[in-house]
A protein has these predicted regions:
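Hydrophobic side chains within alpha-helical segments
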Residues: 16, 89-92, 126
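Helix-centered, glycine/charged polyanion-binding patches within enzymatic domains
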Residues: 35-109, 116
């Protein structure tokens, strides 16, 4: 799991995702993502990295989805979509409780440090919940 901050330009999220996948994937893997990642370029580059993209299909009359039928028919695709909903809850927590909906800091470096701190706080909460469940 990685957490990185970038500028909001419409392409940076996908570029960072591919960069992180290239650094961390050493065997066949899958990646789940929302509709914003359903582009031919992103899907093709994921396949080059031997990563199966489980991206929510962007259904629109003028544009076809970059995800083909052999991916969506697989039972792992439906499971990934379910897990993605749980992950979206984490993003909601980071934005609301963690305070990262709008940054208070100037500069990418300071914002990145704040994001790491919020991520660490969330992980500590998860550990506390797991310990409570184990007892």
């Amino acid at each position: 799991m990685d957490l990185r901050v970038s500028e909001a330009n419409g392409y940076a999220e996908r570029e960072l995702a591919l960069e992180m996948l290239g650094e961390h994937v050493d065997r066949r893997a899958t990646v789940g993502a929302d509709r914003g990642y359903d582009t031919r370029d992103f899907v093709a580059r994921c396949r080059q990295l031997e990563v199966t993209p489980h991206v929510v299909q962007y259904e629109h009359a003028r544009r076809r989805s970059a995800i083909d039928g052999r991916t969506t028919r697989h039972e792992g695709y439906a499971l990934s979509l379910h897990i993605r909903m749980q992950i979206e809850r984490i993003f909601g927590w980071v934005k609301s409780v963690g305070g990262l909906r709008r940054t208070r800091f100037r500069g990418r470096r300071k914002t990145q440090i704040a994001a790491y701190l919020v991520g660490a706080a969330y992980n500590l909460l998860r550990v506390a919940r797991l310990r409570r469940c184990a007892q």
